[in-house]
């Protein structure tokens, strides 16, 4: 009898708590939401280019809106003011990450920096990354690698220039950023290693991004294993695991090479730095690293550091070639400032060309490589633009929509670097109308490394070469159609004819 009475009391108490929460939630002022279907929510309203679909929905429902992806509520932010509230005002309360199937797997159960939810372990790893891997001193120590790889690209393009044959600049720039990554992070020379196949690496980057971007039911239908079952039948689990094993084999190979006592060590790379940290374990009790952490960090750099830099350069060259006056102006400044006799560009030359920096800013605005900041998750109740955002709510910031907001930018669809002529707006996370690297505690830690590669790569392309279109093409034929989800590529690869400038 006593047990029955106790059970009755517990059930009654649980019911009261449940309904109290329900009543409290009814009083909340939630963001506006488009009509949704049962079960799937608003998933049917998301097209092949999610950032564009979300932009169009925001134009109708406002810069802060609530969508339902399956059973998961997601708040989408599409204005500078709302982004500032999320990324600065409430940064601490919404700087966690949702635990997704793909990110859990590729980060080796959240042993990385990008995908790990907020907590003491993440704070210690982030501190280590900023102090040891991506600090200014470390970025500068890899300067010779960036300069050598850009010089190698110039030599390759010069050979094509002799024959006046078109080059796939999209592929050339991907290999440039990939070769820099492999030397900086893995200590492997793209051009000398017998282990690394360039074509397979490009394929692996594509597979990894596709697997992460593909619809994973488990993330949106976490009920009674329903999502897991659908993912198993659809092959999504297999795709993610295939990518995981390929990346693991690659990373394990280079880590084993670094652990070889007979290995020659000309320059310290990122794996060396992390292995040193493991050997010194105990001096910093807040940080405990194992080999899985190295692989988690490498996965972050592999996914975020190769494709994004190449895409920024591709979009910049696309817009410049499409606008002959602009490319003439930026090349005129570069060649006037650097002179006509340089055999090799160095990173000291970058500060001499402010117009090129404006071109890069405008590319970040109009063509951010990652149009949606990686999803955040609230850890407490917050208010954004007067709307209530409950705890455990995913938040997406649409930086592409903000970059094309006519309230912020004159003629936002036009590529106009001179809009930054007398502007203090920068891309380092302090100006919320331009957020290619995010902002706040979750800003991309590899930003200095990525910027250095983009600036030097474009400087080489524009100093040493003039660029012509393949026979039969005019500037009007250059399209800017997009493709992709996590990162946005030019749908039709950029084919140009390099003409070496003597």
Swiss-Prot record:
<keyword id="KW-0560">Oxidoreductase</keyword>
<dbReference type="Pfam" id="PF00067">
    <property type="entry name" value="p450"/>
</dbReference>
<feature type="transmembrane region" description="Helical">
    <location>
        <begin position="1"/>
        <end position="21"/>
    </location>
</feature>
<dbReference type="InterPro" id="IPR001128">
    <property type="entry name" value="Cyt_P450"/>
</dbReference>
<dbReference type="GO" id="GO:0005506">
    <property type="term" value="F:iron ion binding"/>
</dbReference>
<keyword id="KW-0408">Iron</keyword>
<dbReference type="GO" id="GO:0016020">
    <property type="term" value="C:membrane"/>
</dbReference>
<dbReference type="GO" id="GO:0020037">
    <property type="term" value="F:heme binding"/>
</dbReference>
<keyword id="KW-0812">Transmembrane</keyword>
<dbReference type="InterPro" id="IPR002401">
    <property type="entry name" value="Cyt_P450_E_grp-I"/>
</dbReference>
<comment type="similarity">
    <text>Belongs to the cytochrome P450 family.</text>
</comment>
<dbReference type="InterPro" id="IPR017972">
    <property type="entry name" value="Cyt_P450_CS"/>
</dbReference>
<dbReference type="GO" id="GO:0016705">
    <property type="term" value="F:oxidoreductase activity, acting on paired donors, with incorporation or reduction of molecular oxygen"/>
</dbReference>
<keyword id="KW-1133">Transmembrane helix</keyword>
<keyword id="KW-0472">Membrane</keyword>
<keyword id="KW-0349">Heme</keyword>
<protein>
    <recommendedName>
        <fullName>Cytochrome P450 71B20</fullName>
        <ecNumber>1.14.-.-</ecNumber>
    </recommendedName>
</protein>
<dbReference type="GO" id="GO:0004497">
    <property type="term" value="F:monooxygenase activity"/>
</dbReference>
<keyword id="KW-0503">Monooxygenase</keyword>
<feature type="binding site" description="axial binding residue">
    <location>
        <position position="444"/>
    </location>
    <ligand>
        <name>heme</name>
    </ligand>
</feature>
<keyword id="KW-0479">Metal-binding</keyword>
<dbReference type="InterPro" id="IPR036396">
    <property type="entry name" value="Cyt_P450_sf"/>
</dbReference>
């Amino acid at each position: 009898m006593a047990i029955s009475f106790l059970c009755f009391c517990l059930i009654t108490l649980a019911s009261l708590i449940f309904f109290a929460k329900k009543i409290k939630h009814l009083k909340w002022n939630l963001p506006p939401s488009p009509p949704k279907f049962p079960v799937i929510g608003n998933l049917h309203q998301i097209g092949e280019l999610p950032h564009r679909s979300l932009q169009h929905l925001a134009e109708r429902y406002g810069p802060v809106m609530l969508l339902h992806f399956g059973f998961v509520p997601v708040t989408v932010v599409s204005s500078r003011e709302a982004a500032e509230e999320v990324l600065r005002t409430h940064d601490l309360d919404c700087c966690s990450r949702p635990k997704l199937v793909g990110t859990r797997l590729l980060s080796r159960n959240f042993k990385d920096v990008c995908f790990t939810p907020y907590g003491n372990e993440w704070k210690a790893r982030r501190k280590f990354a900023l102090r040891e891997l991506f600090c200014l001193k470390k970025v500068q120590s890899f300067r010779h690698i960036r300069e050598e790889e850009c010089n190698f690209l110039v030599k390759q393009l010069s050979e094509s220039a002799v024959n006046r044959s078109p080059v796939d600049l999209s592929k050339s720039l991907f290999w440039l950023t990939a070769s820099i990554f492999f030397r900086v992070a893995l200590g492997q020379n793209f051009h000398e290693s017998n282990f690394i196949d360039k074509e397979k690496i490009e394929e692996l980057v594509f597979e990894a991004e596709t697997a992460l971007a593909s619809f994973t039911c488990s993330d949106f239908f976490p009920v009674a294993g329903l999502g897991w079952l659908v993912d198993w039948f659809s092959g999504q689990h297999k795709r993610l695991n295939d990518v995981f094993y390929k990346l693991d084999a690659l990373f394990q190979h280079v880590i084993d090479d670094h652990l070889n006592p007979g290995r020659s060590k000309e320059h310290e790379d990122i794996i060396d730095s992390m292995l040193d940290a493991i050997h010194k374990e105990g001096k910093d009790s807040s940080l405990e690293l194992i080999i899985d952490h190295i692989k988690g960090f490498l996965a972050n750099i592999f996914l975020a550091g190769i494709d994004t830099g190449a895409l920024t350069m591709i979009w910049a060259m696309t817009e410049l070639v499409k606008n002959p006056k602009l490319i003439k102006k930026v090349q005129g400044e570069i060649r006037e400032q650097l002179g006509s006799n340089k055999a090799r560009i160095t990173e000291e030359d970058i500060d001499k060309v402010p117009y090129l920096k404006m071109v890069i800013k405008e590319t970040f605005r109009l063509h951010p490589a990652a149009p949606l900041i990686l999803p955040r998750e609230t850890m407490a109740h917050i208010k954004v633009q007067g709307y209530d955002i409950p705890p455990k709510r995913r938040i997406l910031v649409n930086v592409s929509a903000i970059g094309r907001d006519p309230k912020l930018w004159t003629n936002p669809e036009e590529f106009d670097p001179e809009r930054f002529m007398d502007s203090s707006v920068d891309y380092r996370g302090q100006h919320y109308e331009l957020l290619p690297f995010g902002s706040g505690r979750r800003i991309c830690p590899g930003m200095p490394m990525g910027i250095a590669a983009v600036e030097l790569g474009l400087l080489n392309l524009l100093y040493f070469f003039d660029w012509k279109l393949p026979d039969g093409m005019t500037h009007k034929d250059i399209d800017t159609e997009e493709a992709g989800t996590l990162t946005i590529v030019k749908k039709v690869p950029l084919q140009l004819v390099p003409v070496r400038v003597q």
